[in-house]
A protein has these predicted regions:
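Sec/Tat signal peptide C-region and signal peptidase I cleavage site
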Residues: 19-23
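Bacterial N-terminal signal peptides that target proteins for export
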Residues: 1-12
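Active-site phosphate-binding/coordination module
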Residues: 96
Length: 251
């Protein structure tokens, strides 16, 4: 019995060593709004598979430019569905690999309790100096924000107060630092485990902007990579879906 136990233990050790030997580290470009949930998903993924996902956060537009310039990313989690489709068309993404991993929601937010009402009337009142918005040329959430302002017929009136950020993450930083009293950001940035972290907000009605379908795509440098394939499969799993929903996204 002891002899059998020793053999079983040795098998488990060797199997674990083999798993670690096959484990890889991959480079993943992640849309700024999805940073927090992806950090959680990446940690769970590493525990489950041994593979490590090295995350780089930023704006989708900036990632597109970097990928076109040869940046060594193997997987892109974009903040839209157009960029992955474009990369596939241009030969920088793997055909058939794109899929929607999350559907985002836009909010108007301020860290000050009661500053933003639940109908967004604060925008019409205009009693603020600066409104933070991610650059619509770089960030899909910034484009959604401008679409919402146009739908409300407020784009022209509020344009002088708009402060453009490079990414949705920076748009939030402008508000938290006091450079803007309020700003348009992703719901996920203030939502965790079914509750709002702080401040006051208006959940912008989906009818005011185009759907924010966030797609992932395997990039040319990740084609055939076992770790990349494992991560894309994990992103589609119920475990990942639970994390994604806990941050306020739809699937």
């Amino acid at each position: 019995m002891k002899h059998t136990f020793r053999h079983a233990s040795l098998f488990l050790v060797l199997a674990g060593a083999a798993l670690l030997a096959r484990a890889e580290e991959i480079s993943v470009a992640v849309a700024a709004n999805f940073t927090a949930p992806m950090q959680k998903i990446a940690a769970d993924f590493e525990k489950a598979t041994g593979h490590k996902a090295q995350l780089v956060s930023g704006s989708t537009g900036k990632f597109y430019a970097q990928i076109k310039s040869g940046a060594p990313f193997q997987l892109l989690l974009a903040a839209d569905d157009e960029t992955p489709a474009r990369l596939i068309k241009e030969g920088d993404g793997v055909t058939g690999s794109a899929f929607t991993y999350a559907i985002g929601k836009l909010v108007l937010w301020s860290p000050k309790p009661g500053f933003v009402d639940d109908k967004g009337e604060v925008l019409k009142a205009g009693r603020f100096e600066h409104l933070s918005v991610a650059n619509p040329k770089l960030a899909p959430y910034g484009l959604a924000a401008m679409e919402a302002l146009k739908a409300l017929n407020l784009a022209d009136a509020l344009q002088p107060k708009v402060v453009l950020a490079e990414s949705i993450s920076q748009a939030q930083q402008f508000v938290t630092s006091g450079n803007a009293e309020l700003g348009f950001i992703a719901y996920s940035q203030i939502h965790k485990d079914g509750r709002i972290i702080d401040g006051s907000y208006w959940l912008v009605p989906a009818r005011l902007y185009s759907p924010i379908r966030q797609d992932a795509v395997v990039l040319a440098q990740g084609k055939g990579n076992a770790a990349v394939e494992a991560l894309t499969a994990y992103l589609k799993s119920p475990a990942a879906a639970a994390v994604i929903r806990s941050y306020g996204y739809d699937r």
